[in-house]
Regions:
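N-terminal targeting or signal-anchor segments and their processing/structural boundaries
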Residues: 1-186
């Protein structure tokens, strides 16, 4: 059942390509809302392997607006995306607010960190998505060597756009009591 006043995003990432030459239509997503407003904020960054700093493709990146320290093991993410072949990610259509961000190699696909074999990454601080209206240069070429026109165009830049997460596997060990020690004190 759809939630009222909620933005939903279908993220095709790199799954659409043309029929003849197999050129990939990258980063395509479709958003719709059950209310009058479509949330439009974005955050982006890169996910690296903590051991060798190699990019990690195909890993789920998620946001939690519940800032409790145990939310990532109890609740599913409120917004998600996946990393591309270069470990890059963008989470789109975010509601304004404060979030914790996580990366999760989600073995059982429940959008929670709940299996000993799942890799995880996180920031130790919160993120607050924002934007600024700015300009950039756009070049029109006559051919591959000759510039026709350089125009200044406006665009929206979203922040943070340089998040770096490092994925690691938690060393899961059972805790055992090695040596019990009881202390008794007498009233003074």
């Amino acid at each position: 059942r759809d939630r009222p006043n909620t933005t939903y995003t279908i993220d095709f990432t790199n799954s659409i390509s043309d029929n003849n030459e197999k050129n990939v239509f990258e980063n395509f997503s479709f958003a719709f809302s059950t209310g009058d407003i479509i949330d439009t904020l974005e955050v982006s960054g890169v996910l690296l392997n903590a051991e060798n700093l190699e990019p990690m493709p195909g890993i789920t990146i998620g946001l939690h607006n519940n800032l409790e320290d145990s939310a990532f093991v109890k609740l599913p993410f409120v917004r998600t995306s996946r990393t591309n072949d270069k470990g890059q990610f963008t989470i789109r259509n975010i509601t304004p607010g404060t979030y914790h961000i996580f990366a999760l190699n989600d073995v059982n696909r429940d959008y929670k960190f709940d299996q000993p074999g799942e890799d995880i990454a996180f920031l130790d601080s919160v993120i607050v998505p924002s934007f600024e209206l700015t300009t950039r240069q756009d070049t029109t070429w006559k051919d591959s060597l000759t510039i026709d026109t350089i125009r200044t165009v406006g665009y929206t830049r979203f922040f943070p756009d340089n998040i770096e997460l490092r994925l690691f596997k938690e060393k899961f060990e059972r805790q055992y009591m090695v040596k019990p020690c009881l202390l008794y004190t007498s009233p003074s």
